[in-house]
Amino acid sequence: LVRSPGVYFSEDHDTGSGRPLASAKLIPYRGAWMEFETSNRDVIYVKLDRKRKTPVSTLLRTLGYETNEEILELFEDVDNNPDHKFIETTIAKDSGVTTKDEALIEFYRRLRPGEPPNAENAQALIESLFFDSRRYDLGKVGRYKLESNLKGLKFQEIDGSTRILSKEDIVSLLRRLIQINNSEKRANDIDHLGNRRVRAVGELIQNQVRVGFLRMERVIRERMTIQVDPETTTPAALINVRPVVAAVREFFGGSQL
């Protein structure tokens, strides 16, 4: 019994004022998690792949919303509480990052600490984590739950069969988060049985076979760099099925089933 993919909103209450502080988890069927939280100082943070948190305005800049005006315009109809301006406060917290390249480098530092950052590598990393169907998959259930939770918030409709994230998904999620912070919407119960599902044996085997194919692909790519003569190289010299066989044996020999 595992948690279904999708977006889940929850809320804590500030101990001083008692007002709600919303958070959200975007859980894919396969891939990196994206988590959002609101501080008691009205700053909204995001954590990618469970790494260090960053003001969400940095994430929005990596998606192409580069100026403060563009970011504020996305939320002007929901971030309208005069006492709590979440996006303005978040931008002020993130005053050191003002361009897309700076935002990309900031994320790269947090996701790959110790490696020399540059904007090109950072862009490739962000795209591979959340916008590449080979590494990220919401699943049909995840896409359905995402759409049902964010109904009426999107300024651009997304094809229901799309199983990777879009920047519209992220903006709409943040719009809902602000509504919960303003007590205009309610959070959902992440632990409700309706948000759980049974992971069948076939699905477990499928995931393990996928791991085997990825290992086999890596071996093939390595051999292709070594084999210098494409005229004499044959498929049999490049392809080795042992990683797939080993992955399946590993499942049947070591799985809790």
State where each predicted segment sits.
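N-terminal non-catalytic structural scaffold regions of very large proteins
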Residues: 1-256
